[in-house]
Each structure stands twice: as structure tokens, then as C-alpha cells.
């Protein structure tokens, strides 16, 4: 019988907290914390470390990667919140500022497909632009993360 010990990296919680504070301060005023965007790099690094650690633990336990289980676990973790957030956000925009609904179909589709970052790049969107309203601009991070989730097991396999 193979016993698998699931490791928790408790120290990463503090690092994620520091990164989150840096990101929030950076978004409040880019001049306040000039390097605040490094918080995003920290989140990407931690996510990569945790995903690869999880995949390597599965391989070491003799189970293999288990592509189906891996992808289903990620989808179950991310999509329920997206499925709830998108209609709520669109509904609020309908009542508050309908200008925010310009291009909403493309935004919703690309968010759900995990390729919003490419849509934003292709449309020439600037993250801090005040001229082009976009309710889902912050989800570029989730799109990059979803793309990483898609590729990570293939990189190890």
C-alpha cells in the first residue's frame, strides 16, 4: 500500500499576503508602490510551484498524472465562481452604466474560454485605461492561469 502525504506549504500564505497587499496598493495609485506589479509575478511563481508539486506528487505515488482528474479539479475550482460572477456583473452594469456593455459578448466568451488575455492584447486594451470600460479586465490573470493549468501536465508528461 502506498501512502501519499499531502504537503501544505504554510509559509506561502504569508508570501501571498504580501503579494496581495503590493497588488492592491499598486492598483490604488501606481506611484505609491512602483514595484507593486511584482506581486503578480509572485502569485504566478507560487501557482507554478504548487501545480508542479502536486503533479510530481501524483507521479511519485505511482498514480501517474491522471489528466481527467487534474483538469476536472481545476475546472470545479474556477468555473463555479466565473459562472456566478459574469451574469451578476453584467446585470449590475445594465443598471449602473450600460456603456460598460460595449463588446460584452466577446469579453464573456473569452473569459469563459480562458483566453481573455489574448483578446485584450488583440484589441489593444490598456490595463489602466480609463477610456475603454471593461468589466473583466482583471480576469487576464485567470486566463493566464487557466492556460498554465492546461499546459502544466503536458510539460511534465
Give residue ranges: language-model regions:
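Membrane-interface helix/loop caps of multi-pass membrane proteins
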Residues: 1-157
Amino acid at each position: 500500500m502506498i501512502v501519499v502525504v499531502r504537503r501544505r506549504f504554510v509559509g506561502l500564505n504569508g508570501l501571498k499576503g504580501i503579494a496581495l497587499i503590493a497588488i492592491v496598493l499598486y492598483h490604488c495609485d501606481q506611484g505609491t508602490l512602483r514595484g507593486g506589479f511584482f506581486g503578480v509575478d509572485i502569485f504566478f511563481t507560487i501557482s507554478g510551484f504548487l501545480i508542479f508539486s502536486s503533479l510530481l506528487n501524483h507521479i511519485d505515488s505511482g498514480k501517474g498524472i491522471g489528466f481527467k482528474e487534474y483538469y476536472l479539479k481545476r475546472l470545479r475550482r474556477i468555473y463555479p465562481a466565473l459562472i456566478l460572477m459574469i451574469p451578476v456583473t453584467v446585470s449590475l452594469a445594465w443598471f449602473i452604466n450600460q456603456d460598460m456593455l460595449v463588446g460584452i459578448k466577446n469579453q464573456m466568451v473569452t473569459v469563459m474560454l480562458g483566453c481573455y488575455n489574448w483578446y485584450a492584447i488583440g484589441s489593444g486594451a490598456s490595463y489602466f485605461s480609463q477610456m475603454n470600460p471593461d468589466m473583466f479586465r482583471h480576469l487576464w490573470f485567470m486566463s493566464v492561469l487557466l492556460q498554465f493549468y492546461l499546459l502544466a501536465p503536458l510539460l511534465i508528461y
